[in-house]
Amino acid sequence: MKHLISTLLFAALGAVAVPASAEGLDIEVSGIGDAPIAGLKLYSSRFSYPDQPRLTERSGVYDGNAEFHFDDLAPGDYAVVVWADKNENGEFDRSMFGNPKESYMFSNNVHEDEPDWDAVRFTIGGERTQLKLVVSKP
């Protein structure tokens, strides 16, 4: 009976443990201006970019700056786009011709309408990853 309780306790603790391979990502964004919200889309593979982000987040803007923090990301290649969400709709708005309507920046501080995955990808692995992006007008 004692062995059964020990086994069950050990199994329960193992079920809630965070995987050792989980990594973190911190992103500092500046140049947002007077937009009240910054939006971010995080992509986790070449195949999902740019149409299917792994997640979309929003952050409040203070003095033209915003921060995003992510924990428990699997090691690998990622890309992000951040934008000044002036109309607070949670979307990276584009014109009917596909051009960005809001100030934005991709990872690696790439400022193109639709950059290639290789231009914007960065690798998470080892230590916590830090990105600093400066939003620019379209």
Predicted segments, located by residue:
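Bacterial N-terminal signal peptides
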Residues: S6-A15
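N-terminal signal peptide c-region/cleavage motif recognized by signal peptidases
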Residues: A17-P19
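A short, amphipathic beta-strand motif
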Residues: G24-I32
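A glycine-anchored, Pro-Gly-centered beta-turn/N-cap motif
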Residues: G64, H69, A74-D77, E127
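Acidic, glycine-anchored loop motifs typical of Ca2+
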Residues: D85-R94
